[in-house]
């Protein structure tokens, strides 16, 4: 039976970009750009993106298109006799499930904060109270678990509708809204009084700062970001290659996806740094940037409730686009390996993902004594390199 395809090239590009565009584009990329010399770091990053990231995206698309299967079976069909490339499927499958253990939980945080900001829960709070709200959420396993389950059900529900009617149709709308929201938020931040120094900090090439931070460290950060920003290495993009028709150029599609991913990461900095500098609030990285620093920024901003709501809507779309894309990959693992129906694959994986996500939910409260990377670390720290 012929494999289902996307109904349009735009749909393929937006969904593949949605898989690549993750939370790390917002809470990691802008910070390391500012930390390692602004535009000087971006130049190094772009070099690695061209010589490492882009070729691997092309390779993943090629493997998917040649096999017409997910990473669960692609190398079984393509490998030379006697080789062991098929063993990579276990790494790919494990990588997708592990990534979703964290992403579904953090996606729930984004949805919760969207509703909290929409209701005006942060209005009038000082910095300490905003931080207390985040700590309170982490201490509530029922609240986090509930939103995690909602995210899992919503995103698998999209996948259950099929590639064209579900994944493509809904992700296209989310990605277009995401890009529009980014432009609106970036323009608003850049015109804030006092935001100019933030733009200078972010965009001005400062090779002296790169040397001061350590050339080796900056190069390693650029190398790592170029690899992980595109969600490569776990077969997440290979599944979309399996839907590409032979009339399309793989390199051209890979360039489009890479450019969109880079654009979103770059524009995130245009949102964050001018706003933080305008209100003299330190821009940090990681979850604290999103859930503590930026709510404080919005509290200082005229119309902050509206801008905060739009920001967390944008972040929810960024999280959901990745989750839906990876869920589509996970479902394909099941259907390719077992030949089961789409409905059965969805139902089984809903249960699997919810159970596997519980350690992340409980790792901040009931299981908080578990420190996987040493004292002071949490379960979420295992995933921060990627997201």
Label every model-predicted segment.
Residues 1-27, 56-61, 65-90, 245-249:
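Membrane-interface "cap" regions at the ends of multi-pass membrane proteins
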Residues 2, 6, 168, 172-320, ...:
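Membrane-embedded translocation segments of transport machinery
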Residues 3, 32-36, 71-91, 105-160, ...:
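Inter-helical loop and helix-membrane interface segments of multi-pass membrane transporters/permeases
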Residues 4, 33-59, 143-144:
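Extracellular loop-to-transmembrane helix junctions
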Residues 5, 11-13, 19, 141, ...:
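Loop-to-transmembrane helix boundary motifs in multi-pass membrane proteins
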Residues 11-48, 235-241, 252-255, 259-260, ...:
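Transmembrane helix-boundary motif of multi-pass solute transporters/channels
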Residues 32-36, 84-100, 135-139, 150-174, ...:
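Membrane-water interface regions at transmembrane-helix termini and the short interhelical loops
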Residues 385-387:
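Conserved small/polar residues in nucleotide/adenosyl-binding loops
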């Amino acid at each position: 039976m012929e494999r289902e395809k996307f109904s349009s090239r735009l749909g393929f590009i937006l969904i593949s970009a949605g898989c690549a565009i993750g939370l790390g584009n917002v809470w990691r990329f802008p910070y390391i750009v500012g930390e390692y010399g602004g535009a000087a770091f971006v130049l190094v990053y772009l070099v690695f993106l061209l010589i490492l990231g882009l070729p691997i995206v092309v390779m993943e698309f090629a493997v998917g298109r040649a096999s017409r299967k997910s990473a669960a079976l692609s190398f079984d069909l393509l490998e030379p006799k006697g080789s062991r490339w098929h063993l990579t499927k276990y790494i790919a499958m494990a990588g997708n499930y592990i990534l979703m253990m964290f992403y579904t939980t953090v996606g729930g945080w984004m949805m919760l904060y969207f509703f909290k900001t929409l209701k005006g829960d942060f209005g009038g709070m000082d910095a300490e109270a905003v931080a207390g709200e985040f700590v309170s959420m982490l201490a509530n396993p029922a609240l986090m678990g509930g939103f995690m389950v909602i995210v899992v059900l919503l995103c698998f529900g999209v996948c259950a509708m099929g590639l064209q009617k579900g994944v493509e149709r809904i992700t296209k709308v989310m990605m277009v809204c995401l890009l529009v929201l980014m432009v609106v938020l970036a323009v608003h931040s850049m015109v804030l009084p006092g935001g100019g120094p933030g733009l200078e900090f972010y965009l001005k090439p400062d090779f002296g700062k790169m040397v001061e931070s350590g050339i080796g460290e900056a190069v390693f950060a650029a190398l790592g970001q170029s690899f992980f920003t595109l969600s490569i290495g776990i077969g997440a993009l290979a599944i979309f290659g399996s839907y590409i028709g032979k009339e399309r150029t793989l390199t051209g599609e890979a360039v489009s996806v890479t450019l969109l991913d880079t654009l979103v990461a770059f524009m995130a900095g245009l949102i964050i740094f001018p706003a933080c500098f305008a209100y003299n609030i330190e821009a940090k990285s990681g979850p604290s940037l999103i859930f503590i620093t930026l709510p404080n920024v919005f509290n200082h901003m005229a119309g902050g409730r509206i801008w905060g709501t739009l920001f967390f809507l944008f972040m929810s779309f960024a999280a959901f686009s990745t989750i839906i894309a990876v869920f589509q990959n996970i479902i394909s693992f099941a259907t390719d390996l077992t030949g089961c129906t789409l409905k059965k694959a969805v139902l089984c994986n809903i249960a699997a993902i919810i159970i596997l996500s519980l350690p992340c939910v409980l790792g901040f409260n009931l299981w908080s004594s578990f420190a996987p990377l040493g004292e002071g670390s949490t379960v979420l720290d295992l995933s921060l390199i990627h997201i």
